[in-house]
Regions:
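Short clusters of hydrophobic/aromatic residues that line enzyme substrate/ligand-binding pockets
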Residues: 38, 76, 142
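Alpha-helical metal-binding/catalytic segments enriched in His/Glu/Asp
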Residues: 106, 114-119, 124-148
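Bacterial Sec-dependent N-terminal signal peptides
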Residues: 1-22
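Structural recognition of the beta-strand scaffold that forms the well-ordered cores
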Residues: 31-34, 74, 103-107, 115-119
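Periplasmic POTRA and POTRA-like interaction domains that precede
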Residues: 21-24, 30
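Acidic/histidine-rich, surface-exposed loop or edge segments in extracytoplasmic proteins
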Residues: 29-41
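Flexible glycine/proline-enriched surface loops and loop-helix/loop-strand junctions
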Residues: 38-39, 100, 136-138
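A non-catalytic alpha/beta surface segment that caps or lines the substrate-entry region
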Residues: 41-107
Length: 148
């Protein structure tokens, strides 16, 4: 019984430690990607491009295989809405009056018959506008999450 309790405590302590280590490793990523330096990461902006390069470099460090058409990057274009109820047009080719940006794509091969795809966007609202919590007030950097 004493051995079982000791083993349980050992496993519990190790699992808590690894969770904290993981959180500590994630914190600098979140701090950088949500920093004012990236000016809200508006789609196709310098800040969004810097964020994409940062994610690409993290993927490299984590030995995640590139799967985009251009290494880790997959270019796309879209035409922003001029009216809030208008449909958005997205394409993998250039659209007139469009914004061109990149998705970052990586692959972890677990040698399985099945693959789970997890997607997320790293661009955001930049300084606001349509969809912004602050669209009617002073211009502010939107660091993330108010459009979710």
């Amino acid at each position: 019984m004493r051995l079982a309790v000791t083993l349980f405590l050992f496993i519990f302590i190790i699992s808590c430690s690894s969770e904290n280590t993981y959180k500590n490793k994630m914190k600098p990523d979140v701090e950088y990607l949500s920093s004012d330096q990236l000016e809200g990461r508006s789609t196709g902006s310098k800040g969004a491009n810097l964020a994409g390069k940062y994610i690409k470099n993290r993927f490299k460090e984590l030995n995640i295989k590139p799967m985009g058409e251009d290494g880790y990057f997959q270019k796309f274009s879209f035409k922003p809405k001029s009216h809030p109820h208008e449909k958005i047009t997205v394409s993998d080719s250039i659209i007139e009056n469009s914004i061109t940006a990149n998705n970052v794509i990586g692959f972890i091969n677990n040698n399985s018959d099945n693959t789970i795809v997890i997607g997320a966007h790293y661009d955001h609202l930049g300084y606001g506008g349509e969809g912004s919590l602050y669209r009617d007030s002073d211009i502010k950097i939107h660091n993330g999450a108010d459009d979710n």
